[in-house]
């Protein structure tokens, strides 16, 4: 929502919005000319009536319920209401655009595409689900021809989008509150891809290979079967050296500053999208060295009593496993971009939603067993009703059953979580907090618990 607000105000629209929680994002929007209300009430709607030549259009996300005071008052006043996806569709469908969808990696991939296009002089407009380090925000209005957008599949609304190029990163069952089974998710993404001008897809994903006919494929496994490919030559904790191929022919090498095979795939996808837009490979190769992942993607918050504290948005088993594998590579290779070299891996994981935790309890346990120590934060319900037998304690027990030698604890609340991290961690530990809920407050809570040695808010992978 904030990315759309910023772009619309730069396009000359009068934009207002409400959020009861002050934040840096709201401050930045206010600085850009967005009128920000810090309460949500019927009075907000009344204050907007009578201003301008047309009545206001009220835009809401899937997280906003019909019982919301502003929504209810807007209906009483006969105002138009639309979903955020309708506004995003209006942007995507009316200019050349690249829309990135998929179960994992879409925020990072769309960030990388926008960053590469900007670095090579294309000046794109971007609407991303995370903070793009090169822009300092999650959205920007560019003067170039292209728009880059993250297309979120969680509520199915991406079927409204008709981009010039649709990009699919991978498919796994998720968002089980909306999709009863994998086939329903596949069908939704097929509707999205069928409505696009062309499809660029990940050949390494077996579900994509089986169910989709892409106009072009990328791979980090088989350059002979993909239009664009990168094969790792050396994997390190601070990045990857890779050979880059187009249509089976090696055309150069890459120094990717983002570690992990999942990031190599994300970078290859971004390169493929930019190459399809005609950006010279030499320009892209120069720009790759400055790539950074979006906010909350292995985001190093700083050093706390010689512990390295990192925040990550991983909340699906595959994401947790990929993030822990990358962290393990940093520990074992002796190389990392972190402020000091990590010696041990302490995973702090917050389950997100009862439905997701119930669906993937054993998969989460297997992924978390990759850590040296595990602390399970209190489950973040995201408004869901509890499910009997599903809890942080149940997940901790599942980890213990798989890996009896791994110390595992479950925290009843965030205060106890902070105390447990302080008690269980050691100097040299990489404390990796993962989840889509409020576990990202761990750094601030630790800072209150004891002064940090060195904040590193600007340091991110």
Pin down the residues of each PLM region.
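N-terminal leader/targeting and accessory segments in enzymes
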Residues: 1-87, 229-231, 251, 259, ...
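Nucleotide phosphate-binding/pyrophosphate-handling subdomain across enzymes
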Residues: 7, 165, 236-238, 247-373
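Phosphate-binding loop of NTP-binding sites
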Residues: 7-10, 30, 44-50, 62-203, ...
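Short internal beta-strands
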Residues: 13-20, 199-203, 346-350, 370-381
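Beta-strand->loop->alpha-helix junctions that form or flank phosphate-binding loops
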Residues: 16-20, 37-42, 82-89, 127-130, ...
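C-terminal helical cap/extension that packs against the catalytic core
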Residues: 32, 308, 365-427
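Short acidic/histidine-rich motifs immediately flanking catalytic phosphotransfer sites
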Residues: 50-57, 145, 426-429
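Short, flexible loop segments at boundaries between secondary-structure elements
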Residues: 376, 449-461
């Amino acid at each position: 929502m904030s990315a759309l607000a910023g772009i619309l105000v730069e396009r000359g629209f009068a934009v207002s919005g409400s959020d009861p929680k002050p934040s840096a994002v709201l401050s930045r929007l206010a600085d850009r000319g967005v009128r920000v209300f810090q309460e949500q009430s019927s009075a907000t709607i009344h204050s907007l009536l009578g201003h301008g030549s047309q009545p206001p259009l009220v835009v809401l996300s899937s997280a906003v319920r019909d019982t919301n005071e502003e929504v209810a008052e807007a209906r009483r006043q006969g105002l138009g209401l639309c979903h955020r996806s309708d506004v995003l569709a209006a942007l995507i469908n009316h200019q050349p655009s690249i829309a990135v969808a998929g179960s994992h990696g879409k925020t990072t991939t769309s960030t990388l595409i926008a960053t590469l296009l900007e670095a090579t002089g294309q000046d794109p407009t971007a609407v991303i689900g995370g903070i793009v380090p090169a822009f300092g925000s999650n959205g920007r209005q560019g003067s170039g021809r292209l728009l880059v957008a993250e297309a979120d599949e969680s509520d199915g609304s991406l079927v409204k989008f008709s981009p010039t190029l649709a990009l699919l990163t991978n498919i796994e069952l998720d968002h089980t509150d909306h999709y009863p089974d994998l086939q329903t998710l596949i069908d939704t993404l097929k509707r999205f891809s069928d409505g696009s001008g062309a499809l660029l897809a990940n050949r390494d994903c077996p579900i994509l290979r089986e169910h989709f006919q892409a106009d072009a494929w990328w791979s980090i496994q088989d350059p002979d079967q993909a239009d664009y490919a990168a094969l790792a030559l050396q994997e390190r904790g601070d990045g990857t050296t890779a050979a880059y191929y187009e249509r089976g022919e090696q055309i150069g090498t890459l120094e990717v500053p983002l570690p992990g095979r999942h990031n190599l795939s994300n970078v290859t996808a971004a390169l493929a999208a930019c190459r399809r837009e005609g950006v010279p490979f030499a320009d892209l190769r120069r720009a790759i060295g400055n790539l950074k992942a979006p906010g909350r993607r292995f985001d190093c918050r700083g050093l706390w009593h010689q512990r390295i504290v990192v925040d990550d948005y991983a909340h699906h088993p595959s994401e947790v496993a990929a993030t822990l594998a990358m962290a393990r590579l940093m520990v074992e290779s002796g190389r990392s971009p972190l402020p000091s070299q990590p010696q041990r891996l302490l995973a702090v994981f917050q389950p997100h939603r009862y439905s997701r935790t119930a669906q993937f309890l054993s998969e989460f346990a297997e992924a978390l067993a990759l850590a040296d120590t595990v602390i399970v934060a209190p489950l973040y319900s995201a408004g869901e009703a509890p499910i009997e037998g599903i809890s942080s304690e149940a997940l901790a027990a599942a980890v213990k059953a798989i890996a009896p030698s791994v110390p595992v604890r479950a925290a009843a609340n965030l205060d106890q979580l902070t105390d447990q991290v302080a008690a269980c961690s050691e100097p040299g530990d990489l404390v990796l907090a993962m989840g889509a809920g409020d576990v990202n407050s761990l750094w601030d809570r630790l800072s209150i618990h004891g002064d940090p040695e060195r904040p590193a808010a600007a340091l991110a992978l």
